[in-house]
UniProtKB/Swiss-Prot annotation:
This is S-adenosylmethionine:tRNA ribosyltransferase-isomerase. It comes from the Bacteria. GO terms for cellular component: cytoplasm. It is an enzyme of class 2 (transferase).
Length: 345
């Protein structure tokens, strides 16, 4: 397949640059993978689409304030976007500057915190903190929320809450698992009251999620690597859910990628997973774990629209996106959602 096959026309005014006033106020497009049928709904209708005994799996990563500003010793300004925290003192990061810093160069961040550039790994820089603070403490003190480029505005105080799920727990992501942004405490409580089971995996979303696909042939694309964990208790819940004939419903493409990474790494029965994954899901992929998913609307020609197309059918998903444009759904991270069931074999 060609990357250009996954394009669609999107008017700029449909890109959501702010969230709705209430998390659950978004719209929900239901795509039935078994029939290809579409239904326009409100997000709160998800309560009618999830059945007692179904297992919903969420990504509990926490977005860190990963964008830093500072200057080199020469006075030249630079911007740092953390890709990954290596430990309490070291990061891998993208650095934007008129001239790239050389190994040993000192960087002075806003707030006076100091870092040095230790090494370069292709497009990423390994930086170490020279203060008595930890990386997380410095990020919390002077970091900015790393809003996606298409939101096209500076981050604001409200983004610290709204570009974050209510169930976040483990710091490390530099982009939100956006399908989860629609859930608030009340709808989670209502799902539990209905008899829906819940579990949590972790995938620390990297800045690579915003990188465009730079090849023409889908098969030639190389995915960026991200750290993920599917714990043993989640595996046990999945096994029990499948044995009972109920569905595993992933909230977000990051949850999908975590679960299918565990399945790919397992020999035979699903096993726990912890480590880096660069799984690339595109049409032709055989899903082993996920039966349905909640997901936002993704960028044209992105690996995420490819993933959804693999799950529910290429023609069905492209048709759903065109319908969403016609019906003026809101797109991308702060936009509306889809509930998608797997296409019948």
């Amino acid at each position: 397949m060609r990357v250009a096959d996954f394009t669609f026309d999107l008017p700029d005014e449909l890109i959501a640059r702010y969230p709705m006033a209430e998390r659950t106020a978004s719209r929900l497009l239901h795509l039935d993978g078994s029939t290809g049928a579409l239904a326009d709904r409100q997000f709160t209708d998800i309560l009618a689409l999830i059945e007692p005994g179904d297992l919903m799996i969420f990504n509990n990563t926490r977005v860190i304030p990963a964008r830093l500003f500072g200057q080199k010793a020469s006075g030249g300004k630079l911007e740092i976007l953390v890709e990954r925290m290596l430990d309490d003192k070291r990061i891998l990061a993208h650095v934007r500057s008129s001239k790239s810093p050389k190994p040993g160069a000192e960087i002075i961040l806003d707030g006076g915190f100091k870092m040095t550039m230790d090494a370069r790994h292709d497009a990423l820089f390994e930086l170490s903190l020279k203060d008595d603070k930890t990386i997380l403490e410095v990020l919390e003190a002077v970091g900015h929320m790393p809003l996606p480029p298409y939101i096209d505005r500076p981050d604001e105080d409200t983004d610290k809450e709204r570009y974050q799920t209510v169930y976040n727990e483990r710091p490390g992501a530099v982009a939100a698992p956006t399908a989860g942004l629609h859930f608030d405490e009340s709808i989670l409580a209502a799902l539990k009251a209905k008899g829906v089971d819940m579990a949590f995996v972790t995938l620390h979303v990297g800045a690579g999620t915003f990188q465009p696909v730079r090849v023409d042939n889908v098969l030639e694309h190389k995915m960026h690597s991200e750290w993920a964990e599917v714990p043993a208790d989640v595996v046990e819940k999945i096994r029990a859910t499948k044995a009972a004939g109920k569905r595993v419903i992933a909230v977000g493409t990051t949850s999908v990628r975590s679960l299918e990474s565990a399945a790919k790494a397992s020999e035979g029965e699903l096993e726990p997973f912890c480590g880096d994954t660069d799984i690339f899901i595109f049409p032709g992929f055989e899903f082993k774990v996920v039966d349905a998913m909640v997901t936002n609307f993704h960028l044209p020609e992105s690996t995420l629209i490819m993933l959804v197309s693999a799950f529910a059918g290429f023609d069905e998903v492209i048709g759903a996106y065109r319908h969403a444009v016609e019906q003026k759904y809101r797109f991308f991270s702060y936009g509306d959602a889809m509930f998608v069931t797997k296409k019948a074999p």
